[in-house]
Design a protein with these regions (language model features):
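Generic "edge-of-domain/loop-turn" microfeature
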Residues: 31, 56, 94, 123, ...
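Short loop/turn motifs enriched for small/polar and acidic residues
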Residues: 27, 52, 90, 119-121, ...
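Conserved non-cysteine loop/helix-boundary elements of the Radical SAM core domain that shape
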Residues: 1-118, 125-144
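Auxiliary Fe-S-binding modules of radical SAM enzymes
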Residues: 135-266
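Repeat-unit-sized solenoid/scaffold elements
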Residues: 16-18, 22, 112-128, 182-208
Length: 266
């Protein structure tokens, strides 16, 4: 269905109160005044742009067909019409580096979107990227390296008070069947947040010169599993460092926050 046809179907749900609003996504170079007026007319409240990168060279190499300036222009126009702005970025694109992704995140933060999605690049069969991978011209991220990078990005967006509504591809939808290489994991965000917590725990231990032995790590209740890590990997890592860690819920700690005390101090 074309725009107005889709609008006729969805707008009635906004009008009768079934939906609070409609979210859609599109390319940055698809936004103009006419499109904004149509979206507004049919009850769209949030628009996400597939920015993917703010490096013009990376965009060119991946044949995205738009520029970083297109992202800036479209973002400003959408906000001027009162839409909630969402931006999507990808890590590990062909020709991209971790530094490119960090710079992309900084540029996205400067545009002040309400939401962000982060997608590590995944190589699927029967694509140009698959041919580049098979020829050795493209080396995709590993799950671990992508999780380390995305952990940094999550912290950046959190500090900027921007909500990350998705990290990593959804499981299902045919991804597993076509998957060839790259950073795909069905619980990717959990991996990233596990990285955040173990990195913060190690940093806290070093900064406070906590001696080896039994420790208690205080985190928010909903962060206990993240601090523990998948298959208890964070607990095991601390064990290797000489720390027997117990994790407890603490209402005084916020998102991505923790503090550690020696068990003997209780």
């Amino acid at each position: 269905m074309q725009g107005p046809a889709v609008g006729n179907v969805t707008y009635k749900y906004v009008e009768n109160g079934s939906f609070k609003g409609i979210r859609c996504s599109t390319r940055p170079d698809a936004i103009d005044d006419e499109i904004c007026r149509i979206l507004k007319l049919y009850g769209v409240t949030a628009v996400e742009l597939g920015a993917q990168s703010m490096s013009d060279e990376v965009l060119r190499l991946n044949r995205r067909g738009h520029t970083s300036q297109d992202v800036i222009n479209a973002s400003e126009m959408l906000k001027s019409y009162g839409f909630e702005l969402g931006l999507q970025m990808m890590t590990g694109l062909y020709g991209s580096t971790d530094e490119d992704s960090i710079e992309t995140a900084k540029n996205i933060i400067a545009l002040k979107p309400a939401t962000v999605r982060i997608y590590p690049t995944v190589v699927l069969e029967n694509t140009e990227l698959a041919e580049l991978y098979k020829s050795g011209k493209y080396q995709p991220e590993t799950v671990d390296s992508a999780a380390e990078l995305c952990a940094k990005l999550l912290l950046m967006f959190n500090e900027a008070d921007i909500t990350v509504i998705r990290t990593g591809l959804h499981s299902g939808g045919g991804v597993e069947g076509e998957y060839l290489a790259g950073a795909y994991h069905p619980a990717f965000k959990e991996l990233c947040e596990g990285k955040i917590y173990i990195n913060k725990a190690i940093e806290y231990i070093k900064e406070n010169k906590i001696p080896q032995g039994k420790i208690i790590i205080h985190v928010a209740r909903d962060a206990i599993s993240k601090m523990t890590g998948q298959k208890r990997c964070n607990i095991l890592k601390l064990k290797e460092m000489g720390y027997d860690a117990k994790i407890t819920a603490d209402s005084k700690t916020g998102k991505y926050q923790l503090y550690i005390i020696r068990n003997e101090e209780l």
